[in-house]
From Swiss-Prot:
Organism, as annotated: Yersinia pestis
Basic and acidic residues compositional bias, start-end: 12-24
Family to which the UniProt record says this protein belongs: Belongs to the class I-like SAM-binding methyltransferase superfamily. Cx-SAM synthase family.
Reactions it catalyzes: prephenate + S-adenosyl-L-methionine = carboxy-S-adenosyl-L-methionine + 3-phenylpyruvate + H2O
Location of region: Disordered: 1-25
Keyword Transferase in record: yes
EC assignment: 2.1.3.-
Xref: Pfam families: Methyltransf_25
UniProt-listed Gene3D superfamilies: Vaccinia Virus protein VP39
Gene Ontology molecular function: carboxyl- or carbamoyltransferase activity; S-adenosyl-L-methionine binding
Protein name as catalogued: Carboxy-S-adenosyl-L-methionine synthase
GO biological process assignments: tRNA wobble uridine modification
Length: 267
């Protein structure tokens, strides 16, 4: 079997349009007469890489650090889950960095458009660790033999009543010594802090080329489907699920990521 230390060299792009420069997001550049709720449809999937880079501060840092965390936490002969995988950025980052042998990544999303493009994106790169891309509701996935689970800006789109249930399932499916990475947009009890970080995020999007119209229309579409929680709420849920350790490891404005650890020695 090939040496895992050479995997980063093996995870190289094939000739594929999925590895090309992302298409620029201009979905909301013109006024939309009737704004519905946000959906991850074909139009969004087409511009998603550009959209998320220009909308989520620190996104590229989180993605690269997820790879480093995978190198540390992924155990031999285990499974890794990317729940709400979108186009597979976190999956690819983990696959580039996994050194343990006998592993498989299971990437799950409920958007047909995202899943189709994710499969093409994953297939555009060669690597040793196999990836299964699954179109499904993440609540219906039975997590087994997991050493690492990623929820990268996914939980906030789940009905609040189902969030504890999902975290319980993640904890039960993790091996001892396993890790969950939970990235989210945060809300804040302190109104002044929340308003400051909201405005800084607004400035970030403006600096990345979004107009006031684009920012406003996208926010209107998201407000009923992306419901954010405070860091304290996330920690309480994680502890209730059984995680012995949970802490924020990255934050930029009102976006950040927590890591939650299941106690015990890695197997």
């Amino acid at each position: 079997m090939p040496n895992r230390d050479t995997q980063s060299q093996n995870d190289t792009p094939r000739h594929s349009p999925e590895a090309a420069e992302p298409q620029r997001d201009s979905l909301f550049a013109a006024p939309i007469a009737k704004l519905g709720d946000w959906t991850f449809d074909e139009k969004v999937a087409e511009v998603f890489p550009d959209m998320i880079q220009r909308s989520v501060p620190g996104y590229s840092n989180i993605i690269s650090m997820i790879g480093m965390l995978a190198e540390r936490f992924v155990q031999p002969n285990s499974q890794i889950y990317d729940l709400g995988c979108s186009l597979g950025a976190a999956t690819l980052s983990m696959r580039r960095n996994i050194k343990a042998e006998g592993c498989k990544i299971i990437a799950v999303d409920n958007s047909p458009a995202m899943v189709e493009r994710c499969r093409r994106h994953i297939d555009a790169f060669r690597a040793e660790t196999p990836v299964d891309v699954v179109e499904a509701d993440i609540l219906d996935i039975k997590l087994e033999n997991a050493s690492m689970v990623v929820l990268n800006f996914t939980l906030q789109f789940l009905e609040p009543a189902n969030r504890q249930r999902l975290l319980n399932q993640v904890y039960q499916g993790l091996r001892p010594g396993g890790a969950l990475v939970l990235s989210e947009k945060f809300s804040f009890a302190d109104h002044n802090v929340g308003e400051l970080l909201f405005n800084m995020h607004h400035d970030f999007k403006r600096a990345n080329g979004y107009s006031e119209l684009e920012i406003s229309q996208k926010r209107s579409m998201l407000e009923n489907v992306m419901l954010t929680d405070s860091v304290e709420t996330h920690k309480n849920r994680l502890h209730q699920a059984g995680f012995e350790h949970a802490e924020v490891w990255f934050q930029c404005f009102n976006f950040g990521s927590l890591i939650a650890l299941k106690a015990g020695e890695a197997q």
